[in-house]
Structure formats: C-alpha cells, structure tokens
A protein has these predicted regions:
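Secretory/periplasmic and organellar redox-cofactor proteins
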Residues: 1-8, 101
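Local sequence-structure signature of Cys/Sec-based thiol-disulfide redox active-site neighborhoods
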Residues: 6-42
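Short alpha-helical
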Residues: 29-30, 57-58, 89
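Generic recognition of short, well-ordered alpha-helical segments
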Residues: 32-36, 61, 86
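Thiol-based oxidoreductase modules, predominantly thioredoxin-like and allied folds used
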Residues: 46-59
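N-terminal beta-loop-helix "entrance" segment that forms/cooperates
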Residues: 57-67
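Non-catalytic, surface beta->alpha helical segment in thiol-disulfide oxidoreductase systems
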Residues: 76-101
Length: 101
C-alpha cells in the first residue's frame, strides 16, 4: 500500500529552491518516470534534485528512516513526500507551490 501523506510544508530556503531527494532502485519504471519529471523541474530552476541509489549507504539510511512501501522514495526538504509512483495531481500541487514562492 502506498503511503499517502499530505505534502509537507516547505521551509524557505535561502536560495528559494527546495531540495528534493529521489531514492531509486535499478530497473524501476516508477523511478525512471519520477526522475524524468523531477529532473525537468530541476532544469527549470524550481527545485534541486539529488538522486540516491537505494543500495548506497545514504540510500539504505533513508530507507531505514522512512520505510517506503515502494520505490522511488521521494523526499521534499528532507521530509517524506511520497513513495511509489508520484501522482500527477500531487506533483502539480507541489509545482504550484514552488512557482508561488
């Protein structure tokens, strides 16, 4: 079951750009889709995307902390945003929030 939590309140970063961490696994279509969509937002300057392999020490630590039911694990400003495929509506709300900053 996918953990549906509301989008976290985003703290203001000094640069106005929020950090998004994407924890991914190999051969994961949801991971590829999320990376493609978030990378486009990174290139547009709306966020700063960091991709972390699940099998890396940092990835294992994030998995232990957030315990995702699916991949990718997506963190916004260090807080759980979603695990599994990111719903388009939830991502659209995040984009609207980032553009309003």
């Amino acid at each position: 079951m996918v953990n549906e939590t509301p989008a976290p309140a985003l703290p203001s970063a000094p640069t106005g750009v929020v950090d998004v961490t994407l924890v991914t696994t190999p051969a994961c279509h949801f991971c590829d889709d999320a990376h493609e969509r978030l990378d486009a937002l990174d290139r547009a300057g709306l966020l700063r995307l960091t991709t972390v392999p699940a099998e890396s020490p940092e990835g294992r630590a994030l998995i232990a902390e957030h315990r995702p039911g699916m991949f990718p694990l997506t963190l916004v400003a260090g807080r759980h945003f979603h695990d599994g495929r990111i719903p388009r509506g939830k991502l659209a709300r995040l984009v609207d929030h980032l553009r309003a900053r």
